[in-house]
Amino acid sequence: MTLFQSELTYPATATACAIVGSVFDVKSRRVPNVVTLPAFLIGLLLHLALGGWRQMLSALAAGAICGLVFLVFYLAGGMGAGDVKLIMAVGCIAGMSHLFYILAWTAIAGGVMAVGLALVRGKLQETLMNVGELFSHHRHNGLQPHPDLNISNARTLRLPYALAIAGGCILTLYFQVA
């Protein structure tokens, strides 16, 4: 396998796993362990097979970094644990060389999705005010979830964030090929 092929292998595999997670998230609003654990193991084994122990450990670190970034949002009540586990698996598969791009494109995709959902539901102004409220709340209360503006409240706008993760992977893959 050439370097070019192996470099595409990682984001392509991460994209495939993120798409599978997205299907579950859209249908059930959950990303089950039956998706995330095998994806995580695929990432470790893929890096071990193509790059050896050092690359596998680097992939493990990439998964941990992604997980820590998303853990902040989980602890603040902004996303579910399945999303955290999925981004950990995706980070492990993609590895350090794609880590920043996947996180950045995922954030952009998630922001676009959130604004789009707020527009479609006619709640853009309310959503923007809620974002201000969340910033204020977390500035004073740390990561403690807001009493009303969290994913446990059925009245809040919620979106299947695995779609944003898949979007981030697709965009990373696209720009890797382009």
Where are these regions (language model features)?
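A membrane-topology feature that recognizes alpha-helical transmembrane segments
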Residues: M1-A178
